[in-house]
Amino acid sequence: MRYLLLCAALCACAASGGRLVPAVEAPVLLAEFDSAAAAARLRWNQTPGPLFIAYELQRAAGEGQDFATIARIESAAETTAVDSGLAGDAAYRYRLLLHHSRPGRAPRVLVSGQVEGGIHQLVITWRLPSGFLPARLVVDGQGVVYVAGAGAARVERFDRAGHALGSWGLDAGQLACLEAVSLAVPALAVDRFNNLYVAYNLRERGKAPRSQWTKFDGRGRRIWTYPLEGIFARAVAVDPEGRIFIEGLNQLYQYNPEGELVARYPLPSLPAFGLHFWKGYFAVLVFPHLFTDGDWQAPRLVAYSGPERGEAVMIMGRDPASPEDSGGGLLRQPLDFAVDEATSRAFVLDAGHSGVVVFRHNRFLTSWGKAGDQEGAFRFSGAAEVVEDLLTGAAAQRQVMAGGIARDQEGYLYVADTFNNRIQKFGP
């Protein structure tokens, strides 16, 4: 027997030019999923050169899907690959096929173990009290998730795992919500000291809605409640210097942390909604296509250098290439957005796509979502009571669009899935 093994080894050595060829084993594949690039970075161990034919990298996208080849690599020294353009909240599986020759026999294929993962995958969902209709949310520096809705004049609080921490009441009156490009409900913002600011509107029978705002400290102590200038408060945001800005229908108001009015700025007639700060810039969703003579034919996310919204420094979104266009980067009915300044990403909640659209460096990066009530799906369209007459406060049930999104310091994303009455949390 030892004689036969020796003969076999000598034959293999002769077939390889006199060199003793090491045994070839199945490759070991590793993967790192990078949401900032919407990519999977793959690497594997190098195969001994004399018997190498090719690596074949395969991917299966989605549960129950078959593997398909995405790359064939014919250099044994090339042991890395990047699969870009990944969709969010999708399950990806990869495997590596090693094609190698065998002296005196037919070539063979060795298959690695599978690696799997994804970006922005669903982590958890939790429901709100019946009829709450969550539509705005924010996360403070301690990881407390604050949620405001169209159905109650209070703020619900949760930890990042969805455990209820109790609610803070705003007023004994009834909320006034306004149908604009998105449903205007109580607006939320936090400062670096974890104080919460809530700007909201209350119905008064036979009168215009009353706008006011409340400041809570991080323990829930109501510090003050003051009336607001202007007509119908729609957004509140705190800039990096701690200045507070509240947007009404036609003006932007600046306040200090004590609630004192500092300045007011007239807003251009261009339809816009939402307000967040991005690297100190005033970022809003703009709907110029609502003007028949506008140059843009679809909404944009625009960051302006100042409160007057005169100079745009960043613009995200594009016009449709055709009436049937539904491709990446085209915003249809954006509702809210969150930003990641470190990687220059914007996460736009878009009812037109029933999901989240992500931009990086002003360019489309990825997206995910679909309409429905199963986990990971969204319902941003539904019925809510809205003010029809700002002079009298008269209200009626209407079909509206609503939804909100926020990001915590670790990169997790929280979506207010309004008409499924729940919050959905997605991974970084």
Regions found by a protein language model. Name each.
Residues 83-104:
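Beta-strand-rich modules
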